[in-house]
Amino acid sequence: MNEGRIRVRFAPSPTGELHVGNLRTALVAWLAARSTGRQLLVRMEDLDRHNSSATIASCQLSDLAALGLHWVGEVVFQSDRFDLYRQAIDQLTASGRVYPCFC
């Protein structure tokens, strides 16, 4: 593993306001990145399209910034990567490495 590429991430779900648990996780990730010279990334877990909101995501990011918990680079939205995930699933399925789950 390339030590220089290790990153720390915070991945909230934009389905409601940040709460104490979210903020604790964000603070721990930010402190871990800062204390080790790593980068903090933010990835929005917005695949729950029914409950996710761009307005809430924006509010969450504003709250983090207001608290001084800054990240590096653009925020990654999982929904923007859906096509990549579909390609990976298709490759795994074609190679016989996927089985249906009926749970």
Locations of the language-model features?
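N-terminal Rossmann-like or analogous alpha/beta NTP/dinucleotide-binding catalytic cores
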Residues: 1-103
